[in-house]
UniProtKB/Swiss-Prot annotation:
This is Secreted mono- and diacylglycerol lipase LIP2. Disulfide bonds join 68-308. It comes from the Eukaryota. The gene is LIP2. PANTHER family: ALPHA/BETA-HYDROLASES SUPERFAMILY PROTEIN, FUNGAL LIPASE-LIKE DOMAIN-CONTAINING PROTEIN. The lineage of its organism: Eukaryota, Fungi, Dikarya, Basidiomycota, Ustilaginomycotina. GO terms for molecular function: hydrolase activity; metal ion binding. Its main location: secreted. Pfam families: Lipase_3. Its EC number is 3.1.1.-. It comes from Malassezia restricta (Seborrheic dermatitis infection agent). Belongs to the AB hydrolase superfamily. Lipase family. Class 3 subfamily.
Length: 315
């Protein structure tokens, strides 16, 4: 049954994307937003990334580090120190908290563990369900989330918020940042609204998610845009399959904030304003798993097979 669910999920993604895939070379500029089955599509021109590259490199290293099985508290990753770790990276995705000189208290979630069945099943539980208003009371009316990701976040949420508040006080730190790869990127996306509601001090400095799958519907994407205050970014590397899944045709929608590295693993990256920008990753039809666990801002994020401890800007 478990294998059937995974196979069915991948088959649906492939079929729908083949039928509806966007052509290459889209040049339309206006209007800025266009309806796609009632959902927003941006035609805004790409821009330079809005922050210094070293910031994204530090985020990438911390996104990689939470995937490492062998680690110890107080390990250094760039300008950050590991403070806390939770989860078995099977039923519960590993969460790690760092104190970074440049980013504040950083929460990083590991990506899907392909060697553990519960981690795979959580990622395959693809149905859209209503947001749990106990955690997300400020989400837009009608907001829905990917069931497996919402369930995974709810398991960690009480511990996460408690430890986050503790380390903010311990380090007298007002900045909070969120990151992760793949499944972990989805949890960083979901955490944004919950963290913002529960902060006792400070604010969310940045959220940078790598290899982010679509996590919710149009109303959830709108909620991220509204509450992120322009500080949410997700990075697509080349023809990464995961960033293109689940398909929009199933009701899913990315929020604003895409940074696309194209070609994959290169030093060519641009920021694509608005939701589902046609000039960004949606303009290419392709499915690459190697691009998913690749090099982001000259920093490898390769899950279990990457640098452990993670390195910053050395790839």
């Amino acid at each position: 049954m478990a294998c059937f669910r995974v196979i069915l999920y991948l088959s649906v993604i492939f079929f729908v994307q083949c039928v509806f895939a966007a052509p290459k070379g889209i040049t339309k500029v206006a209007p800025e937003n266009h309806n796609f089955f009632g959902r927003i599509t941006s035609y805004a021109h790409p821009k330079d990334v809005p922050d210094p590259v070293p910031m994204y490199q530090q985020f990438a290293a911390l996104a990689q580090q939470s995937n490492c099985h062998n680690y110890h508290i107080n390990i250094s990753v760039g300008d950050a120190t590991l403070l806390y770790s939770w989860g078995d990276n099977d039923r519960n995705q590993r969460l790690q908290l760092f104190h970074s000189k440049s980013l504040g208290i950083v929460a990083s979630w590991a990506g899907m563990n392909p060697t553990k069945i519960n981690s795979i099943l959580g990622a395959a539980d693809v149905f859209l369900v209503d947001v749990d208003r106990r955690y997300f009371p400020h989400a837009e009316k009608g907001a829905k989330l990917y069931k497996g990701f919402q369930d995974a976040y709810k398991r960690v949420a009480p511990t996460f918020i408690k430890e986050l508040q503790y380390y903010q006080e311990l380090y007298n730190e007002d900045r909070v940042s969120l990151t992760g790869l793949s499944y972990g990127a989805a949890l960083a996306n979901i955490a944004l609204l919950h963290v913002k509601k529960n902060l006792k001090r400070g604010s969310i400095y940045r959220t940078v998610a790598f290899g982010l799958p679509r996590v919710g519907n149009q109303e959830w994407a709108n909620s991220i845009d509204k509450h992120a205050d322009g500080k949410f970014f997700y990075v697509a590397n080349g023809n990464d399959l995961v960033v293109r899944a689940p398909p929009r045709e199933l009701g899913y929608q990315h929020p604003s904030g895409q940074i696309w590295i194209n070609p994959s693993n290169s030093s060519k990256w641009k920021f694509y304003p608005g939701q589902e920008n046609v000039h960004g990753a949606n303009s290419e039809f392709g499915y690459s798993i190697p691009d998913h666990t690749g090099v982001y801002f000259r920093t490898e994020i390769a899950s279990l097979w990457g640098h452990c401890p993670a390195t910053v800007g050395k790839d």
